[in-house]
């Protein structure tokens, strides 16, 4: 789209950009999640509008996609893949590294099973890696990167919450659809490698590691625990509670803005990127207005994380309690 066609978004960005630049945080990134590109309409204009932000905020280092990128409701396997490719190409065109957490919609299996489509058309892990792993330095769909700043040194961990066994049944079909899972192999990597650092750690995942206390989507009356818990999640939850270098957990999946403190560890979720209002507490969304989208610029400065909202919703501020302990106690605590 042309700059003029994006004005319905970018006309609302200047005040937010001014706040980000005034903050002058040493670590800044974009977090966007649950794009579901082309399910309702295209998210590509939203991504293209980010050029306006990046041109004016040179301190933004990378983008994190929280998963569920395309339209897995499309019965045409190539149409589904095309929706994935278009959103990934738009993000890659931003000119900054793009790091992806794989979502439970991304392989297409959930809808293929629900609609009795041929699951052999699913996007399997190797194809997913080719699609989403341009800046992934490993051959897995989970990894970490290290970033040094004047304020401290950090590790960004990107988990794969769809790390399930892709095994076929007697009919050659894949039986596991919406299933969220951390494999034993990934859990061991997380415990023994990802957490093995003196850096402050931020953990990104599609779904929360634990649904306890997380408000989300669906038809449940209380809006709590909308989906099955992440298989393997309790194991990772145990270790992030124990490893005091983990400063925050950031995820999507529930299409809702949550900040929940598990003792001294904040767990953060962010609204879906396009239009849907899946719970009564979500803000109203209107197409071709600023509220059609929702994404954050995430800024870390000292013991605080600032989430500057572009689109529906509000700015948020997160107390990085464990980071404060490093300031006063001189180091991260690994019990």
Spans of features found by a protein language model:
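Extended active-site neighborhood of metal-dependent phosphoesterases/phosphodiesterases
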Residues: 8-14, 74-192, 235-236, 242-245, ...
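Short active-site segment of divalent metal-dependent hydrolases/proteases
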Residues: 37, 70-71, 106, 209, ...
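Short, surface-exposed beta-strand-loop junctions and turns on beta-sheet-rich folds
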Residues: 313-315
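Active-site glycine-centered loops adjacent to acidic/histidine catalytic or metal-binding residues
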Residues: 34, 67-68, 103-104, 206, ...
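His/acidic metal-ligating clusters that form di-metal
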Residues: 13-23, 52-63, 92-93, 155-158, ...
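Short, solvent-exposed beta-strand-to-loop segments that form ligand-recognition rims
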Residues: 324
